[in-house]
Amino acid sequence: MGKEQNPRRVAENEAFAKTKMLRTSPQKLNLVAAMIRGKKVDKALADLTFSSKRIAGDVKKCLQSAIANAENNHNLDVDNLIVAEAWVGKNLVMKRGRPRARGRYGKIMKPFSEITIKVRQVEERA
């Protein structure tokens, strides 16, 4: 008579990972997310490894977490995984300031964002 198990939030052949508080704007993060959408996970990992974008390393960690979740928690085959979805959301915006001329104050916005990566197992095509 234990605790009831929560229902799955994704389909049987899917797994996901979410990373919050990434110190970049959602617009810049979405450029990296668009780079991996729809690709096989090994190709997406290679693209992130050699990307010149600063945030690509954090996206790579999130993708590796999604792959590990698929393998360990959902018993999916890693060789047949694709990046089904990768979406980006806004998080908080830290507000900072800089003194300006004539006693004024310039606002500096430091945005944070979050990314969710969903991987799906596809059937092997013969």
UniProtKB/Swiss-Prot annotation:
Pfam families documented for this protein: Ribosomal_L22 (PF00237)
A cellular component term, taken from the record's GO annotations: cytosolic large ribosomal subunit
BP-aspect Gene Ontology terms: translation
Transmembrane segments: none
Keywords for the protein's UniProt record, in alphabetical order: Ribonucleoprotein, Ribosomal protein, RNA-binding, rRNA-binding
Molecular function as annotated in GO: rRNA binding; structural constituent of ribosome
Known function: This protein binds specifically to 23S rRNA; its binding is stimulated by other ribosomal proteins, e.g. L4, L17, and L20. It is important during the early stages of 50S assembly. It makes multiple contacts with different domains of the 23S rRNA in the assembled 50S subunit and ribosome.
Subunit structure: Part of the 50S ribosomal subunit.
Recorded family membership: Belongs to the universal ribosomal protein uL22 family.
Full protein name: Large ribosomal subunit protein uL22
Originating gene: rplV
